[in-house]
C-alpha cells in the first residue's frame, strides 16, 4: 500500500517505527571518514565511495588489475550516516559545538525563558507526552556582547566553525591523485571568487564581507557547521512541516532524517498546525543541519489565524521562543511595505507568498506600515544575542511567469538591500530570498539586481519555476531555473517537490525534490568551475566506459534507483559484469565498440611501428650492431 493510501493512524505508526529502529546507515559500498583540523574537536564527516579495480590485461586465469581511488563526497547526514554511532531520537544528537561555544566565554545560561508562550507550554502538564524529554537550557549573549559568526569574522577571529567549513568545502579533493579524475573544464563564474583551495581565512573573509553566512544558533549545538555563499558550493534547502490537516511529530522527525540522508544542507520547518513548539524541539534536538523557520506562521496561530490581530508583541515573543529553542535562521517579510501592495493589483496571481499575504493584509487593515519593518532594529538585537541569521523574505515574489520581474518584486528587493545594511550594523548575518516563477530569459536579471542592490549578500531562491504548465512535475520545471540561477551566483536553492501547488509532500516527494535539486546545484558548481566539482563525474564516466556497473550505481546520487532501473531488464548477477546494457544490447553498445576501436588502433600502431623498424633494419644491411657514426 502506498503512503498516500495509508490511514493517518498507519502513517503515524510507520513513522514511529522508523524513529524507534533508526540507526546509522551508509550508502552502498561507502564508508564514513573524518578529516581533522587544528582546533580541538574539528572532525569533519565525509562519505567515501569505494570503487572496484579496473581490468587492464592478463589472462582469464591471471587477470591484471589497476586500483581505482575512493571518491570522497560532501555528506549532510551527520550521525545518521555513520553506522558506528548509536542513534536515539529520544535523547537527541551529541552537542558537537557546545565546547566551542562555551570556550568563547561570551554566553550565559538563562534561568528563566524570555518567551511567555514558552513558559506557558512548559507549565502545561497535558503536553508531557508530546514533549522532548531532554529540553536544552538556553543560552544568550552576555550583556554588551555579540555572539555571531559575523562579529567574530570582523574581529579577525577564525572560529572552529570556520575551519570545519573550510575542510568540508574542499571535499577531500586533496586525496585524489589521478590526473584523469582531477581534470576539469574551465568554468564561467560571473564574477565569483573560487580559490583552488578553500582556507579557514578565506571563509572568515567571506563572512566578514557579508558575502557568506554560517547559520549557527548558539542554542543548536548539535548542528554541523556549513556555509551559504556564492563563492562556495551551491547549497540546497528542504522544507518540512505539519499542517492543521495532516502530519505529526513522528512524521516530521522522519522527514528531517530523510532529508539529511538525501543531501539537504538546511531544513526549514514550516509547521502551521498544532504543537508547533513541541514539533520544533524534536526537530532541533535531532538535526545535524541548520533549521530555519518563518516565525509569522506561529505568531498567526497565537492570534487564532486572524492576520489583523497580529501585534509586534506577539511576534517578538515568537522570535524569543524560537531563538531560545535553537532556530538558526528566520525568514522575515520586512520588505512588504504598505506602498508596495497596490503594485500587485494588476498581477495575474497577486501575492502568493504566505508570509507576504499575511503582512499585506495586516498593513491594509490597519493602514499602517509593516510592523516588521518598523521594528527591524529590535529584530536585529534579538538575532545578535543568539546568532540567528536573517533570511529576508520575498513576500512579493511572482507566483506566475506573467508576473515575473515586475515593479513590486524589485521594489521589495531594493528594500531588502536597505535592511541588509541595518542588520550588518548589529553583526547579524543576512541572506536574501528570491523568486519564484521566472522564464529562463529573465532569470539572470534577478541575480544581477540582487548583487547590486543587496550588496552581495547570499541569494536564496525557490527554483525559480521556468514554466507554469506542469503541476506534478514542478520539481523539474523549477530544477531548470535552479541550475541556471545557481550558475549565475545564487548561494542556496530551496527545493520544490512534485507536490508543489498540489499538496503537502510525503517522504518520497521529499527525496524526489532533493535529488532534483542536488543535480541542479551540482550542475551549477560545474558551470561555475568550483574546484574539484568534476571529480565525481570523471569517476562515473570512467566506470561507465569500463563497464564497472557496481561502481556506476554507487557513484550515483541515488544508487538504489540506478540499480533498480538496471535490474529491471538485466537482474542476473552476470548483468553486473556484462559489457553492455539493455538499451543497445551486446552488439550495438557504443562504449564497447569504442573500446574495440581503441584496442584496434593501439594494435595497429604497434604493428606499424614494428614494420617500420623491420624495414629500417633491412635498409641498414641487416647488421645487428651499428657503427657509432650511424647510431
UniProtKB/Swiss-Prot annotation:
Q: Which reaction does it catalyse?
A: 5-amino-1-(5-phospho-beta-D-ribosyl)imidazole + S-adenosyl-L-methionine = 4-amino-2-methyl-5-(phosphooxymethyl)pyrimidine + CO + 5'-deoxyadenosine + formate + L-methionine + 3 H(+)
Q: Which organism is it from?
A: Shigella boydii serotype 4 (strain Sb227)
Q: Cofactor comment in the record?
A: Binds 1 [4Fe-4S] cluster per subunit. The cluster is coordinated with 3 cysteines and an exchangeable S-adenosyl-L-methionine.
Q: What protein family is recorded?
A: Belongs to the ThiC family.
Q: Identify the gene encoding this protein.
A: thiC
- Using the chain's own numbering, where are the disulfide bonds? none
The record's listing under NCBIfam families reads: PRK09284.1, PRK13352.1, thiC
Q: What is this protein called?
A: Phosphomethylpyrimidine synthase
Q: Which positions in this protein are listed as binding substrate?
A: 239, 268, 297, 333, 353-355, 394-397, 433, 460
Q: Which UniProt keywords apply?
A: 4Fe-4S, Iron, Iron-sulfur, Lyase, Metal-binding, S-adenosyl-L-methionine, Thiamine biosynthesis, Zinc
Query: What does UniProt give as GO cellular component?
Result: cytosol
Q: What interactions and quaternary structure are annotated?
A: Homodimer.
Amino acid at each position: 500500500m502506498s503512503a498516500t493510501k495509508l490511514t493517518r493512524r498507519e502513517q503515524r505508526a510507520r513513522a514511529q517505527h522508523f524513529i524507534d529502529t533508526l540507526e546509522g546507515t551508509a550508502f552502498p559500498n561507502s564508508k564514513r571518514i573524518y578529516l581533522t583540523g587544528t582546533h580541538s574537536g574539528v572532525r569533519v564527516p565525509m562519505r567515501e565511495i569505494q570503487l572496484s579495480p579496473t581490468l587492464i590485461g592478463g589472462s582469464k586465469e591471471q587477470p591484471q588489475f589497476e586500483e581505482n581511488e575512493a571518491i570522497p563526497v560532501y555528506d549532510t547526514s551527520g550521525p545518521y550516516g555513520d553506522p558506528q554511532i548509536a542513534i536515539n531520537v529520544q535523547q537527541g544528537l551529541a552537542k558537537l559545538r557546545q565546547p566551542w561555544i562555551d570556550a568563547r566565554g561570551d554566553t550565559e545560561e538563562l534561568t528563566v525563558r524570555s518567551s511567555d508562550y514558552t513558559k506557558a507550554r512548559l507549565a502545561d502538564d497535558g503536553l508531557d507526552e508530546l514533549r522532548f524529554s531532554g529540553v536544552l537550557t538556553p543560552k544568550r549573549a552576555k550583556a554588551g556582547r555579540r555572539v555571531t559568526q559575523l562579529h567574530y569574522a570582523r574581529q579577525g577571529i577564525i572560529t572552529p566553525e570556520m575551519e570545519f567549513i573550510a575542510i568540508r568545502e574542499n571535499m577531500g579533493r586533496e586525496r585524489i591523485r589521478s590526473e584523469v579524475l582531477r581534470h576539469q573544464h574551465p568554468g564561467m563564474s560571473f564574477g565569483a571568487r573560487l580559490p583552488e583551495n578553500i582556507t579557514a581565512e578565506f571563509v572568515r573573509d567571506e563572512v566578514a564581507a557579508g558575502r557568506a553566512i554560517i547559520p549557527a544558533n548558539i542554542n543548536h549545538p548539535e548542528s554541523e557547521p556549513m556555509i551559504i555563499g556564492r563563492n562556495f558550493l551551491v547549497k540546497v534547502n528542504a522544507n518540512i512541516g505539519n499542517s492543521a490537516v495532516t502530519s505529526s511529530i513522528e512524521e516530521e522527525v522522519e522527514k528531517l532524517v530523510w532529508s539529511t540522508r538525501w543531501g539537504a544542507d538546511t531544513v526549514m520547518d514550516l509547521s502551521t498546525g498544532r504543537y508547533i513548539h513541541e514539533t520544533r524541539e524534536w526537530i532541533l534536538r535531532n538535526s545535524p543541519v541548520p533549521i530555519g523557520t518563518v516565525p509569522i506562521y506561529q505568531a498567526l496561530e497565537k492570534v487564532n489565524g486572524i492576520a489583523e490581530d497580529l501585534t509586534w508583541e506577539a511576534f517578538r515573543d515568537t522570535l524569543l521562543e524560537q531563538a531560545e529553542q535553537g532556530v538558526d535562521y528566520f525568514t522575515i517579510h520586512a520588505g512588504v511595505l504598505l506602498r508596495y501592495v497596490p503594485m500587485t493589483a494588476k498581477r495575474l496571481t497577486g501575492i502568493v507568498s504566505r508570509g507576504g499575504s499575511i503582512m499585506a493584509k495586516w498593513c491594509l487593515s490597519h493602514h499602517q506600515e509593516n510592523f516588521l519593518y518598523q521594528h527591524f532594529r529590535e529584530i536585529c538585537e534579538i538575532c545578535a544575542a543568539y546568532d540567528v541569521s536573517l533570511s529576508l523574505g520575498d513576500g512579493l515574489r511572482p507566483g506566475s511567469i506573467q508576473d515575473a520581474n515586475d515593479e513590486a518584486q524589485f521594489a521589495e528587493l531594493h528594500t531588502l538591500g536597505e535592511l541588509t545594511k541595518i542588520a550588518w550594523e548589529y553583526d547579524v548575518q543576512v541572506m536574501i530570498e528570491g523568486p519564484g516563477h521566472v522564464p529562463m530569459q529573465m532569470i539572470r536579471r534577478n541575480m544581477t539586481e540582487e548583487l547590486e542592490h543587496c550588496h552581495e549578500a547570499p541569494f536564496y531562491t525557490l527554483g525559480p519555476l521556468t514554466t507554469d504548465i506542469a503541476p506534478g512535475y514542478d520539481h523539474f520545471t523549477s530544477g531548470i531555473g535552479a541550475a541556471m540561477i545557481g550558475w549565475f551566483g545564487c548561494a542556496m536553492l530551496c527545493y520544490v517537490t512534485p507536490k508543489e501547488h498540489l499538496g503537502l509532500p510525503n517522504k518520497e516527494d521529499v527525496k524526489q525534490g532533493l535529488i532534483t535539486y542536488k543535480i541542479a546545484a551540482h550542475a551549477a558548481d560545474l558551470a561555475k568551475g568550483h574546484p574539484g566539482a568534476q571529480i565525481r563525474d570523471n569517476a562515473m564516466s570512467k566506470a561507465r566506459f569500463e563497464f564497472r556497473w557496481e561502481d556506476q550505481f554507487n557513484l550515483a546520487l541515488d544508487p538504489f534507483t540506478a540499480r533498480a532501473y538496471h535490474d529491471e531488464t538485466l537482474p542476473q548477477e552476470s548483468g553486473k559484469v556484462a559489457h553492455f546494457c539493455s538499451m543497445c544490447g551486446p552488439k550495438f553498445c557504443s562504449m564497447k565498440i569504442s573500446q574495440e576501436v581503441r584496442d584496434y588502433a593501439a594494435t595497429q600502431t604497434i604493428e606499424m611501428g614494428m614494420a617500420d623498424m623491420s624495414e629500417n633494419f633491412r635498409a641498414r644491411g641487416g647488421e645487428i650492431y651499428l657503427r657509432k657514426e650511424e647510431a
